[in-house]
Amino acid sequence: LPALPEPVPDQAPSSSPAHGRLSLLVLYTDRLEECRAFYSALGLSFAKEKHGDGPEHHAAVLADGTVVELYPVLSAPTGPVRLGLEVDGRRATPPLPPGRHVVTDPDGRKVEVRAHGAQAADTPAGNGGA
């Protein structure tokens, strides 16, 4: 890859939408319900959707407005994808302690999860854990 130019001090990158941000991620799977359960266990809240003649699928809106959709594979599968999520570890099932975790979804995709929130030991008894 070519080297990127160094930012000019008064034009430093910002997190403003004018500089772009991910707004949609679609994962195609032949294990739709398994993937929905997997990502739901990480704290994503999915709604079932159908647009026109398209297939039923699941959609979740992340805290920053990014939409994550799970679609059934209807033709040739798409290429691999690297996925990273930031979640409240207390809402995961089982709860995840703060930090970086790498998990595998039902389609074999490696998912990097950065959990924040209370330590797993700080979660109420009966909510899972090691």
Predicted regions and their residues:
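Core segments of cupin and vicinal oxygen chelate
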Residues: 16-20, 26-68
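General helical structural elements
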Residues: 35, 86, 113-114
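A short, polar/proline- and glycine-enriched secondary-structure boundary/capping micro-motif
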Residues: 46-47, 79-82, 122-124
